[in-house]
Amino acid sequence: MQFEIRIGPHKQRAPILKDLDLRIQMAEKEKARNTFMGFVNKVWPEFIAGAHHAIMAKAFEKVARGENKRLIINMAPRHTKSEFASYLLPSWFLGRFPDKKIIQCSNTAELAVGFGRKVRNLVGSEQYTKVFPD
């Protein structure tokens, strides 16, 4: 986001712009903590969301809040089902609820282990700890 502020010399603008940038960062961090798509956008900035991603995100948020105990997603291949459900959702969920446990399962052990490693690597990353510092 870029703004143009006209309030005099650079000395006066610099602290205001710094404060504005800090407020934007804090708002983005809060959105990433509280919404699944906010988290996706923070850890995967080049991701381009479609309408089906927003629907999945809302469903995942309901599951995380305990409003929905079961969820089945039927979608064509290559629509980010696995990236969302097996990688990004567990990462976001563990950040929100660090006392909970996740079971990683798939049709092959190799795939489940691979997603588990991706989750572990993301949770240990610098960009993740900026969202969930604890």
Identify the meaning behind each predicted range.
Residues 2-134:
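Phosphate/NTP-binding elements of NTP-utilizing enzymes
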